[in-house]
């Protein structure tokens, strides 16, 4: 039987309560899972989403960034982070992460659309963030154009 202090058990219980909408239970369980295993990026992802859904986008942003260090090509994480940034009014950042989400989902049409929107707002974005997106987009576009 699994131990109640097993970080996987805590993460899954936290995710269960998050999905049910019981954010206070999810909060405690996910924080406990992250304390025991700080590298459990799935616990951090659910925690970021829980923070985001409870109006704490600034805190959520730190966790989304941490998760992306572990799984930089995860389309779902980029999409969730984009939606969170959109709630704060950071349209440039939101479009950058929506473009990544489309790139990593291999959705050429959406990637082009979001990349162009990010490019139009690039003056308001972190220049390094946009340059990284531009490089990833060009690399993926070359592959798409060959096929």
Predicted regions and their residues:
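TPR alpha-solenoid repeat register
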Residues: 9, 43, 77, 94, ...
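Terminal, low-structured helical/coil segments at or just beyond the last alpha-helical repeat
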Residues: 104-147
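Canonical tetratricopeptide repeat
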Residues: 12, 46-47, 80-81, 97, ...
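Canonical positions in the second alpha-helix
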Residues: 32-33, 66-67, 101, 117-118
């Amino acid at each position: 039987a699994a131990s109640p202090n097993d970080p996987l058990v805590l993460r899954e219980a936290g995710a269960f309560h998050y999905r049910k909408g019981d954010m206070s239970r999810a909060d405690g369980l996910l924080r406990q899972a992250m304390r025991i295993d700080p590298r459990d990026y799935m616990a951090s992802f659910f925690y970021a989403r829980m923070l985001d859904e409870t109006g704490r986008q600034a805190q959520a942003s730190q966790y989304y960034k941490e998760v992306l260090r572990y799984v930089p090509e995860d389309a779902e994480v980029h999409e969730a982070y984009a939606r969170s940034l959109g709630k704060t009014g950071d349209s440039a950042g939101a479009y950058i992460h929506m473009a990544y989400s489309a790139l990593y989902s291999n959705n050429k049409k959406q990637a082009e659309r979001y990349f162009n929107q990010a490019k139009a707002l690039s003056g308001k974005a972190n220049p390094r963030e946009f340059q990284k997106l531009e490089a990833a987009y060009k690399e993926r576009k070359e592959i798409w154009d060959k096929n």
